């Protein structure tokens, strides 16, 4: 299970994401330049140069034609995946924290930070005929977030809803057509939600939180189904597309990290059984907290991005597929 070490960023990784086929792996970091890699051998195919601040989020559409990024330079950009050119750049009033394409690829959503006297806002834009004039057009929908800022986001089924995770541990579902909240979970986490990822069929999602837990939720009712407990903040969590497995990654805040933390196993990727909530494996590798995790769409490998600036792609041994959890 020898990993691929992808070294192309000068600062810590903020998010990693596979495209639908899994042949491309996209990574964003605080060094202003998102990268795209060939996931099979770790070759860097290119960079997307244009942001002037830390890039906090990215997403690639269903056909791997467009890439959306959000950054601390108060812009969200739409890119041509193949040529690396900027299709459109949209200015915002504060940093862009999350961005996602809808399943159809017709729309994209992004949210801004609660900072500099500005409230957090959720925006939805139409990207079907996106060009440079997109920055001058009004968004399809704008929803102000009065209570707590959005820290993670996913589209619901049929592009009808958006699921948001918040800084206060709250989760909500919003109707895209009406711009109204339709389901509110209350405060499910005792601290902020760092990450949220859907299962392959979109019926469930897993959240990663600063309260040292990851939780599995029903995507329609927001009922909490399972809880995976650790001893330190969880920065990211992902659900395997082929097994009932969840992988968790995290660690202390970067400012609290010491050299002894690596030896203590604080930066391992931790595997839990989806149903039994039991940890069954750990994988070492990063020299700092893990900030983002993603399973390959075929379930035979996974990738992790860390505070150390490395992206690691781990392929599973044959024993992983042979050993059935009992």
UniProtKB/Swiss-Prot annotation:
Subunit text: Component of the eukaryotic translation initiation factor 3 (eIF-3) complex. The eIF-3 complex interacts with pix.
UniProt similarity note: Belongs to the eIF-3 subunit I family.
WD repeats: 8-47, 50-89, 145-184, 188-227, 285-326
Role noted for this protein: Component of the eukaryotic translation initiation factor 3 (eIF-3) complex, which is involved in protein synthesis of a specialized repertoire of mRNAs and, together with other initiation factors, stimulates binding of mRNA and methionyl-tRNAi to the 40S ribosome. The eIF-3 complex specifically targets and initiates translation of a subset of mRNAs involved in cell proliferation.
Compartments it resides in: Cytoplasm
SUPFAM superfamilies associated with the record: WD40 repeat-like
BP-aspect Gene Ontology terms: formation of cytoplasmic translation initiation complex
UniProt superkingdom: Eukaryota
Main location: cytoplasm
Protein name (database record): Eukaryotic translation initiation factor 3 subunit I
Molecular function (Gene Ontology), one example: RNA binding
Name of encoding gene: eIF3i
Entries under HAMAP family matching the protein: eIF3i
UniProt entry keywords in alphabetical sequence: Cytoplasm, Initiation factor, Protein biosynthesis, Repeat, WD repeat
One GO location term (cellular component): eukaryotic translation initiation factor 3 complex, eIF3m
């Amino acid at each position: 299970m020898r990993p691929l070490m992808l070294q192309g960023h000068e600062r810590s990784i903020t998010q990693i994401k596979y495209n639908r086929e899994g042949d491309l792996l996209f990574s964003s970091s605080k060094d202003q330049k998102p990268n795209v890699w060939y996931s099979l051998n770790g070759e860097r195919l290119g960079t997307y140069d244009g942001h002037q601040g830390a890039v906090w989020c990215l997403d690639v559409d269903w056909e791997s034609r467009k890439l959306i990024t959000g950054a601390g330079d108060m812009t969200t950009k739409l890119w041509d995946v193949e040529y690396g050119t900027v299709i459109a750049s949209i200015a915002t009033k504060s940093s862009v924290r999350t961005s996602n394409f809808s399943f159809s690829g017709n729309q994209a959503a992004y949210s801004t930070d609660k900072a500099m006297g500005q409230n957090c806002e959720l925006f939805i834009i139409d990207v079907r005929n996106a060009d440079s004039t997109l920055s001058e057009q009004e968004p399809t929908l704008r929803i102000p977030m009065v209570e707590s800022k959005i820290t993670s986001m996913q589209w619901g089924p049929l592009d009808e809803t958006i699921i948001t995770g918040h800084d206060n541990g709250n989760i909500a579902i919003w109707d895209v057509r009406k711009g109204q909240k339709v389901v509110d979970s209350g405060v499910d986490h005792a601290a902020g939600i760092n990450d949220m990822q859907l299962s392959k069929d979109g019926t469930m999602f897993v959240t990663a939180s600063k309260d040292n837990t990851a939780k599995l939720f029903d995507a329609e009712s927001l009922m909490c189904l399972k809880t995976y407990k650790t001893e330190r903040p969880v920065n990211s969590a992902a659900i395997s597309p082929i097994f009932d497995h969840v992988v968790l990654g995290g660690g202390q805040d970067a400012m609290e990290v010491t050299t002894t933390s690596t030896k203590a196993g604080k930066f391992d990727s931790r595997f839990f059984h989806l149903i039994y909530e039991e940890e069954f494996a750990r994988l070492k590798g990063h020299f700092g907290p893990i900030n983002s995790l993603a399973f390959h769409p075929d379930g035979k490998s996974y990738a992790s991005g860390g505070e150390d600036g490395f992206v690691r792609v781990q392929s599973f041994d044959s024993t992983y597929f042979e050993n059935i959890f009992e």
